[in-house]
Every structure is written in structure tokens, then in C-alpha cells.
Amino acid sequence: MTKTTLSSDPWSIKKPTALLVLADGTVIEGEGIGAIGIVEAEVCFNTAITGYEEILTDPSYTGQIINFTFPHIGNVGTNSEDIEDLTPLHHYGAVGAIFKAHSSPSNYRANENLNQWLKKHQIIALCGIDTRALTALIREKGAQNAVIAHDPNGNFDINALKERAQKWSGLLNLDLAKEVTSKQSIEWNEKPWIWNKGYTINNEYNFHIVAIDYGIKRNILRLMAAQGARITVVPAHTSVQEILAMKPDGIFLSNGPGDPNATAEYAVPMIKTFIECNIPLFGICLGHQLLALAVGAKTIKMHQGHHGANHPVKNLITEKVEITSMNHGFTVDSTSLPQYVEETHISLFDSTNCGIQIIGKPAFSVQYHPEASPGPQDSHYLFQRFHDLIVNYREQSNK
């Protein structure tokens, strides 16, 4: 394909300082902000209106460039409290971002503007393009392998960038969980943010949850802490023996990036053992996919994925609809679920699987993000469900 401008300003004649080069040869020009450099990644689009800082620091976006459909990004600035990456010094999350327009901040919590923050977090950004036209392209052709490049002088070797985009192998068969996981165990006690108080600390522990970190988000941990849990976050490569020695009352399988089939090589044998031990299990996103793989189901790469804070999901048990936050490019093939696994939730956009539970076992998972951050809180009840399974497990264990 030929070079494409997709500029949001049709009269602009400025020399482009950033490019997005797709593997199909499409070249999109715009203004560069944030980090300077070149990186290969998969381009997806996110339809959330708010929460750009939380989105960009979600480790599940590792290896991806996010095209924001909402036109103005940066309005509320950035701060040190809204980061979702558990280890922000390593800057796990999206490697690139695309905005129609970046705005000056106007918010009492802001301590940096978007450009400064992007530089610090090593995220390359392309601005001044028609992001909805790019979204239409992704919807038609699917998530695209690409290169995003930023040079303040506007010097680019387009042929070389096209070659890099075409040679990048993409997210299939890529285990990114091992790249973003914690390097050592962490004790977590921070609870959700409260107006005029900030984040509070949980000092009363009623039970112990071990959270396996495949790329976990902070707000997931906060909501479990709010239930009175002592939480130990462990690296993804922690052995079954080490986890069982911690005597958990429940085990959480976290969200994370990459191809679940690649992470499954070491994760699935562990999860199978936990299922056999009847320890309560709760999985979110990648954790959901890994639980499904552990019971013999299959996962597949999606055409464009689901990324946004406005995705309707039907609870097949209650017949209620939840508006959810989603971020995944792989999905569980519901036709591959064994008979002893019940499908509990489906997407109302495309009927893809969004939840399962193992019949006769205290184990369940969802594809979407009930913790939101950003997004609606319709699905917070799932943390209470996990809590109730743990309480029942403790009662049975003490008999």
C-alpha cells in the first residue's frame, strides 16, 4: 500500500516526526511525542474514554501499540497513583500509543503532562492522525504487526521500517508473562483509593491468597485486600511446592500479555495440581485462558481482540448483562470446553467466551477485567464470590 497521512489537520504541511508502518506496507505520518526510537509491536485499538494512564501501564499490553479512539488524550495529566504495573521502574505495558490530539492537563492530581510521562515510561507516541480511520482499518484487516518510530528531526528510512514490520513474528507463540512477572515474592496490603484519603492499608488478615503474577494489575490486588486478604504475589515461575508450602486459602491466576499457549508450558501443570488439591482458584484474562487450557480446552488468536471499557457481557447463570472492561487478543474456544466445565459468561458483541467454572470444584475465571481501572464496576461481585469460596474451603479444612 502507499503512504497514508490520516492527519486530523488536512491543512498541515509540517514534516512528520513520527510514523506508524504496518506490515502490509501502509505508512501513517504524524507528530511524535514521548520516547524517541523505533519498536515493533502489534497495533490494537481501545475504546475507553478515560483511564489512559492505567491502560498504558497495564502489563497485558506488553508488545502492543494502543490506538485510542477517544480524540483527546492527556486532559487529566498523569500521576504516580494511577499506574497499574506492579513494578513501574521496569516500565511494563504498552510500547507505543496513538492519539488524535494530546491535551494540556487540568486536574488537581496531575504532576506531569503526557509528553513528560511518556518519555519517562519509554513509550513512543504518534499524534495528529485520524485514529478512527485507523480503527476501521484494524476492524477490516485485523490486529496489525507494525513498527512505530519517533525522530524529532523527521529522518526515517521507510523501506527499512517496512522490512522490520514484515519480519516481526507477532504475538503468536510468544511467552511475555516471563518477561513482566515479578522477580521475587511481594507482600501486598494496599486497598482501593478513597476520596480525600488516597489508598488505605489492610491491617486485618482473615485468609491468605497467593497471587501468581503473569502481569498482574494493582487494582486487582487492592480489591482482594479490601476483602481482608493477606496477599502474597509470587513470580510466574514459582514452583507448585513453594506455593503449597505457603498454605494458601486461595490461589489467584492473574492477567498478563502474550500467547496463553506459550505460557501454558509451565503454568498449566501447576494449575492442574491446584485443581486436584481443591484449593479455590480465580483467574482473570490470561489466568482465565490458562485455567481453560488446564482442563483441556483450546485458545485461539482473535481477529482484532477486545480492548475497551464498554464491552457488554451476559452472565449465563443470572441472565444479567454486565458492562465490562476488556483487554485481550486471544480467546477460549468455547466448543473445546469439556463437559465438566460450564460456560458462565459470553460477549454480547461476538458471543466469544468470557467465563467458565469447573463443576464440582471451587475454580472459576473470567476473560474480562472485573477490577476495571479503568472501567465500570458491574463485576466487582466476582471478588466476593472468590472470598465466599475461600471461607467455605477454610470451614471444610477445619472440620
UniProtKB/Swiss-Prot annotation:
Catalysed conversion reaction: hydrogencarbonate + L-glutamine + 2 ATP + H2O = carbamoyl phosphate + L-glutamate + 2 ADP + phosphate + 2 H(+)
InterPro entries named among the record's database cross-references: Anth_synth/Amidotransfase, CarbamoylP_synth_ssu, CarbamoylP_synth_ssu_N, CarbP_synth_ssu_N_sf, Class_I_gatase-like, CPSase_GATase1, GATASE
Gene Ontology biological process terms from the UniProt entry: 'de novo' pyrimidine nucleobase biosynthetic process; 'de novo' UMP biosynthetic process; glutamine metabolic process; L-arginine biosynthetic process
Enzyme class of the recorded protein, top EC level: ligase
Active-site annotation: 285 (nucleophile), 369, 371
Keyword Nucleotide-binding: yes
Region (CPSase): 1-204
Chain residues that bind L-glutamine: 60, 256, 258, 286, 289, 327, 329-330
One example GO MF annotation: glutaminase activity
Function: Small subunit of the glutamine-dependent carbamoyl phosphate synthetase (CPSase). CPSase catalyzes the formation of carbamoyl phosphate from the ammonia moiety of glutamine, carbonate, and phosphate donated by ATP, constituting the first step of 2 biosynthetic pathways, one leading to arginine and/or urea and the other to pyrimidine nucleotides. The small subunit (glutamine amidotransferase) binds and cleaves glutamine to supply the large subunit with the substrate ammonia.
Protein name: Carbamoyl phosphate synthase small chain
Gene designation per UniProt: carA
